[in-house]
């Protein structure tokens, strides 16, 4: 099992604090009905953190026309909107919300090259709120495919997410199925697609990064 390279410090801190708490309980408290449940809870929390920050092995379903999900989660928005930062035109917004139990590693949605990148520090409202897209901490990535189609996506931090990691670099290659970053704890991904893209999912669907095709771009 691979662990996200930017999360190893977080895991070391979690494991260290958990080990100290467990040791103090065992040495000083010595009351089984207190010690055993707390130690079990700490162990469960450490295992959950490992699962949370792992990089899953997935079958690659995307291409330069098939747009796959950037993250695991549930589709909460599919609507027509105006994207003013990169596309600068009417488009389709598709948003995926990640809860605490979803893998939070993010993956490139389509083959192409990075045409735009910008990071914004910001607030930490709950990611399910509409204003989170603009006011929360977020990073923005624009991708142009070999056929000239453009898509845009945002990694949005949530109420508990306090750090966004994005590996995008201007003019670097994006290949669907490869990791592009991670958001630590509950968060959201907004993807902006051309109006003529054929949407393959519906609001309420659970999607998986790399494997679930969100849309097909016109040739």
Predicted regions and their residues:
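Contiguous, well-folded functional domains in the mature portion of proteins
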Residues: 1-219
């Amino acid at each position: 099992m691979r662990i996200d390279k930017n999360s190893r410090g977080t895991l070391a801190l979690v494991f260290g604090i958990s080990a100290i708490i467990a040791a103090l309980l065992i040495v000083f408290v010595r009351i089984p009905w207190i010690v055993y449940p707390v130690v079990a809870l700490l162990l469960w929390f450490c295992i959950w953190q490992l699962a949370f920050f792992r990089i899953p092995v997935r079958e690659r379903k995307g291409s330069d026309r098939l747009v796959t999900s950037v993250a695991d989660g549930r589709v909460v928005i599919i609507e027509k909107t105006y994207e003013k930062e990169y596309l600068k035109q009417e488009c389709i917004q598709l948003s995926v919300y990640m809860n605490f139990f979803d893998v939070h590693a993010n993956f490139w949605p389509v083959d192409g090259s990075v045409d735009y990148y910008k990071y914004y520090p910001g607030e930490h409202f709950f990611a399910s709120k509409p204003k989170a897209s603009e006011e929360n901490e977020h990073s923005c990535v624009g991708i142009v495919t070999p056929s000239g189609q453009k898509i845009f996506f945002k990694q949005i931090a949530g109420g508990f997410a306090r750090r966004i990691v994005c590996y995008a670099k201007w003019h670097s290659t994006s290949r669907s199925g490869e990791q592009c970053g991670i958001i630590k704890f509950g968060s959201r991904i907004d993807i902006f697609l051309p109006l003529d893209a054929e949407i393959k999912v519906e609001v309420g669907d659970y999607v998986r990064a790399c494997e679930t095709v969100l849309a097909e771009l016109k040739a």
